[in-house]
């Protein structure tokens, strides 16, 4: 997966977590939780009786909060489901216009430019390249879409999402016209969540794409000329996985044997799954509900504006820190100047004293004594 931060390739993703792997994961989590519980118990035991009582009351308050939060999540899900149904007629109308099924109402004012484009408009239906343009204008998705992908994504007619209940999660559906790349008319991506209210991914399942011969976008064929003098004169052909948006339909796979995966590989796998979920949630939460704004680029500008505000806030904080540092340095410089001035005055006084005394040592060794800096010379 082409992510600038992690530099992982989606081509390495192939399948979903199986039941055995999930059981192993649950056991590991249980062991960790037991260890954490022991640590928490030690914390409470180390508290004084009065403080421990207060903490116990705080825990009861937290339990009440968690119950309210659970109720909030439940009501929010019901509210989202209610409005999701009301969105559907709007999405259906959008799809009809985008795909040229219906024409918009009203007559446009005829101009000379419109006359020149009339023949072209009569052939051009709907809004060409609507979805691929919208997706490319999103920063997260733009990193996944290659030039080779664009040809296939031009046949994308619509994208829909829906909740699934058993197990909890959501499903994305990509509807395609008949195209020269693959035979599927619908590609799906399903996310199973451990907790619907929190983005904790259990597994993801994608459609197996049925590519036409020589049209697979997730692989590239490398041909290497045989070495001179080789008996085989035919070029050597090698197939390699390559970056492509369509790798999105091949989610990560955990090895059957957990011993085959080390800590670094496990961390990489986790990052891949997080990136995969990020792509899916971006399509669900941003592209589908605000598709025309992404098509025109307005949504991207809004995001850039928000990012710019955040950057300005960070710069302001940095400037304030720098100003404070400058003030501290100025104060230190002033202190140094005061010290230098004091030393100069001391030297002048000492010189005057030596002139008056003729430089002779005093009887007690103090009035005619040289200043400390002179002793060190």
UniProtKB/Swiss-Prot annotation:
Coiled-coil boundaries: 26-80
One term of GO molecular function: chromatin binding
GO BP terms: double-strand break repair via homologous recombination; nucleosome assembly
Acidic residues composition bias: residue spans: 300-341
Protein name per the record: Nucleosome assembly protein 1;3
Chain positions of motif Nuclear export signal: 47-62
Gene name of the record: NAP1;3
Localization: Nucleus; Cytoplasm
InterPro entries assigned: NAP-like_sf, NAP_family
Pfam families listed in its UniProt record: NAP (PF00956)
Chain span(s) of sequence motif Nuclear localization signal: 223-228
Residues carrying Cysteine methyl ester: 374
